[in-house]
Amino acid sequence: MFNDTPQMVSETDVVVIGGGPAGATASTLIAQKGYKVELFEREKFPRFHIGESMIPETYWVLERLNMLPKMRASKFVHKHSVQFVSANGRQSAPFYFYDNKPHECSQTWQVVRSEFDLMMLNNAREHGVNAHEGVRVLDVLFDGERATGVRIQEPDGQ
């Protein structure tokens, strides 16, 4: 990987750009397979983000990431159903997850993204991911068709 002054920073197998849930998930799963992963996130966590409502199917991914014990120990609100309300106030009947799929996964969480995203990023670190916060990826460097590194901007602007 390279910074603005094309100087080699490190050898790695995989670079992941973005440390939100998708980036943290991808980097953790790759690291679990034994690859050396560098993750770059332009923001410093925790940071505000929209999108708090999880669905039951996230259980299986959280299980693969070894996140279930952390989620169970968290103070996030447990979610057992959904109900929809239209703009005119009309409400649907509640949809209880357990009625559709009687399994432990039928309970999920309503998360605070700033806290959840930090938990996910720290979990990636626990699995060996070298996560860099406050670092912007400016460009992906190629040698022909092969990506060979990234050009980054450090928090101090370098």
Language-model-detected regions and their locations in the chain:
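Beta1/beta-strand and adjacent pyrophosphate-binding region of the FAD-binding site
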Residues: 6-20, 38
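N-terminal FAD cofactor-binding segment of flavoenzymes
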Residues: 47-89
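N-terminal Rossmann-fold NAD(P) dinucleotide-binding loop
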Residues: 23-24
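Glycine-rich FAD pyrophosphate-binding loop
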Residues: 15, 31-50
